[in-house]
Amino acid sequence: MLEAKSAALLEDTIDYVFDNQALLLEALTHKSFSNEQNDRTEPDNERLEFLGDAVLGVVVSHYIFRTFPHLPEGELTRIRSEVVSEKGLTVIGKAICLGDYMRLGKGEERSGGRQKSSLLANTMEALLGAVFCDGGFDSVRRVIEALFIPHIQRAARRKTGVDYKTRLQERLQARFGDVPQYVLIHADGPPHQRSYSVEAHFRGSCIGQGQGRSKKSAEQAAAKQALEYLEE
């Protein structure tokens, strides 16, 4: 049985107190522990893990959808995937010392189960599923946002493969109902080493300039500068 002190410490860490302590116990119980019980009455956390995975996806998706209204779908998907991945969940699990509270069988304990990424990630999902069952959607949303927002923000700052042209077009369409135009100003250099200069125009005004080794890269640079101009 999980000690009351241990339960209270974990609840304090996630800032949520369970009405039904059995749900917390179940969330922390690995199947290796359940299998070693003679009466087999200790449920493992796999069902709660299934539920927590779904709830986490919804809450994180909704948060990044609200917080980053100008990011294209591909970037939203990238951020969510990074945050809810096994690696992302393991980072959260280690931050709250979740491994210290897990109930493991003897074999899993000997093999270092408390530090295994897969176990930490699965138990993290089970814990969120337990919060949802105990307190409902608003409760689990608050827990998830408190734990995950810093990691979401970090993932959002990693602008891997950002399509600035798409982002600029979506921003201008949403705000003004119109799209930008890209104007090639000049191209310099020999064919094998050309440099292009492009301006992003909107309703007759230049809102960004960019240079690149191709017209596409120059347009992306111009769109990036235009976005920075709009955010000033």
From Swiss-Prot:
List GO terms (cellular component aspect).
cytoplasm
Which keywords has UniProt assigned to this entry?
Cytoplasm, Endonuclease, Hydrolase, Magnesium, Metal-binding, mRNA processing, Nuclease, RNA-binding, rRNA processing, rRNA-binding, tRNA processing
Annotated ranges, domain DRBM: 163-232
One of the entry's Gene Ontology molecular-function terms is: ribonuclease III activity
For this protein, the Enzyme Commission number is: 3.1.26.3
Q: Which residues form the active site?
A: 53, 125
Q: What domain of life is recorded for the organism?
A: Bacteria
Binding positions for Mg(2+)? 49, 122, 125
Enzymatic reactions = Endonucleolytic cleavage to 5'-phosphomonoester
Presence of keyword tRNA processing:
yes
User: What PROSITE patterns does the database record attribute to this sequence?
Assistant: DS_RBD, RNASE_3_1, RNASE_3_2
InterPro entries named in the record = dsRBD_dom, RNase_III, RNase_III_dom, RNase_III_sf
Tell me where in this chain the RNase III domain is found: 7-136
Q: Report the locations given in the UniProt record.
A: Cytoplasm
Report TM segments.
Answer: none
Which cofactor(s) does the record list? Mg(2+)
Main location class:
cytoplasm
What's a single GO BP term from this record? Answer: mRNA processing
What is one Pfam family matched by this protein?
Answer: dsrm
Protein family: Belongs to the ribonuclease III family.
Describe its assembly.
Homodimer.
Q: What does this protein do?
A: Digests double-stranded RNA. Involved in the processing of primary rRNA transcript to yield the immediate precursors to the large and small rRNAs (23S and 16S). Processes some mRNAs, and tRNAs when they are encoded in the rRNA operon. Processes pre-crRNA and tracrRNA of type II CRISPR loci if present in the organism.
> What is the name listed in the Swiss-Prot or TrEMBL entry for this protein?
Ribonuclease 3
Q: What is the lineage of its organism?
A: Bacteria, Pseudomonadati, Thermodesulfobacteriota, Desulfuromonadia, Desulfuromonadales
